[in-house]
Amino acid sequence: MHIIHISKFMALLAISTIAIPTRGRSEVDSRDVNQAQTVTSGSSIAPSGSEKRPAWKAEFAEQIAEAQRDKKPFQCPHCKDGISNRVALYTHVKAFHGDKPVYSLKNYHDERRFDS
């Protein structure tokens, strides 16, 4: 019993040591940031939101969206969201749509297409 309490205390101590910044560690972190800022000649580290999307991303946006839809073979019949598997579909419908029926609209139409 005491071993469990001691191990919990040691884990808590280890987490708190990592989470609380010390004087030495904060100086190292700030120095790294200052060096990164001087390398970029005073420009901000994070890119600004006003930058335009690269041309190649705009060109292939539809193909990227189609590939993402293909990775999710199930579709919620209520909100048309793409879902990756049956368990996720069941969980999604129960969580967001309550007592509505659980079935996949995309698979229903695919099966009917192959039956004809």
UniProtKB/Swiss-Prot annotation:
Disulfide bonds: none annotated. GO terms for molecular function: zinc ion binding. Coiled coil: none annotated. It is found in: Secreted; Host nucleus. Residues 1-24 form the signal peptide. Residues 24-53 are annotated as: Disordered. One of its GO terms (cellular component) is host cell nucleus. Residues 33-47 have a biased composition (Polar residues). This is Host transcription reprogramming factor 4. It comes from Pyricularia oryzae (strain 70-15 / ATCC MYA-4617 / FGSC 8958). The gene is HTR4.
